[in-house]
Amino acid sequence: MELTQENTEENEKTHVESIVKFEDSNRGTITDFHIETANNEEEKDANVILNKSVKMEVEEVNGHVDSSSTETDIEMQVIQQPTIPKKPPVSAHRRGPRKHRGNANSQLNLSTADHQRPLYCICQKPDDGSWMLGCDGCEDWFHGTCVNIPESYNDLTVQYFCPKCTEEGKGITTWKRKCRLRECSNPTRPNSNYCSDKHGVDFFREKVKLSTVEPSAIKNLVLFAKKREEFQNLGTVGPTLPSQVPPEVVYNFEIEEANRLNAEIVQLNKEKEVASNKKIFLQLIKDSSRRAVLAYKEREGIKKDLCGFDSRLLFNQQQMNELWEKVSNGAPLSLDMSIDPSPESTCFTEKRRCAKHTSWQVIFTEDFELQESNILQKLNMKQTAKDVMLEHQKQRCLPGIQYDGYARFCHEQLSPEKMANLLK
């Protein structure tokens, strides 16, 4: 009986020692797991909980575990103990200037003490998640809507200075060259006006749609130009027209029209000369009438103003030509000449009582000027018609392309190969 009790006590002692060894071995594993997953304060709490758990297990084994208990049951009880999850680290980070700011919840570090959010921009409002850009002078953030810069210009900004920094002289905002396509906000490629070949083609397609020139004519013009500079210079230099028109390009009706125009131009030039002589003749008659009136007033002792109209102003063209020939002796009529007074043709009636010749000087002056003006207008019309017809004759010597009118190029500008491509 005593032997049996001793064996039982030894078995219980051995069983307890094995449990303690098993717990010691598992304690290291669990402790390592908590060290890797928890912070320093959480590790201390986990060790305390683990020590208490081991003591409770040992007491439970000593008090309640019978000889049928196994190590597997105790192991499952220890493994099922709850673990403490670790807290994710929280850090604040503010990105550099000219970067897109994301969601406010992920970008702003809310203060745990007063829960105040930082204020930005000239509007002094917090980050609401809209697009902002940073100033390279004061390194503050500004809403794009507050400084009138759209978000699409983000990639075009080289450096940005807010209005205050610009006013203080810290710098000015600089930009990259924008693609010429209106709806594109990308920067251009080096040595180009476009961000891509596609946008270059799209840009000129829009230009062609707005042009009044037919697309086929533009194609011919492109074929004519070998380089971009040549295409840009089209139309800046006109074609070289021949000085003489070859007879083979002149039509018969144009010959008749040219003869008629030449005859009319000759006649109008003669009328122009006559009108000019009439104005000179009027001035000479005024001088002659003044001398005749003065002589008459001295002879008659009259102090009142007299009419002084000279009826020689009413001469027909033939009579005027004879008088001019007599005055000028065959030379062109000029104001340096003079006409002898003629008392027989001069009116010596009191000026205010002569209703027949009222304002005769003004009337004849305006009449002769109007005659000359009408003749000059007719002469210009005839000369313009002659020049247009001659221009058409010269243009028929040149190759032409029809496009809302005619674009013409001289032979010297085109090689035979280009001429063939141009006239296809």
Swiss-Prot record:
Give residue ranges of zinc fingers (PHD-type).
Answer: 118-168
Q: What is its main location?
A: nucleus
Which keywords belong to this entry? Metal-binding, Nucleus, Zinc, Zinc-finger
Comp. bias (Basic residues):
92-102
The family database entries (InterPro entries) matched by this protein are listed as: Spp1/CFP1, Zinc_finger_PHD-type_CS, Znf_FYVE_PHD, Znf_PHD, Znf_PHD-finger, Znf_RING/FYVE/PHD
Keyword Oxidoreductase assigned: no
Q: Which CDD domains match?
A: PHD_SPP1 (cd16039)
What GO molecular functions are on record for this protein? methylated histone binding; zinc ion binding
GO terms (BP aspect): positive regulation of DNA-templated transcription; transcription initiation-coupled chromatin remodeling
Q: Kindly indicate whether the keyword Nucleus belongs to this entry.
A: yes
Q: Domain of life, per the record?
A: Eukaryota
* Cell location: Nucleus
Region: Disordered, residue numbers: 80-108
Gene Ontology cellular-component terms listed: chromatin; cytosol; nucleus; Set1C/COMPASS complex
Assembly notes? Component of the Set1 complex composed of ash2, sdc1, set1, shg1, spp1, swd1, swd2 and swd3.
- Function comment: The Set1 complex specifically methylates 'Lys-4' of histone H3.
Protein name from the UniProt record: Set1 complex component spp1
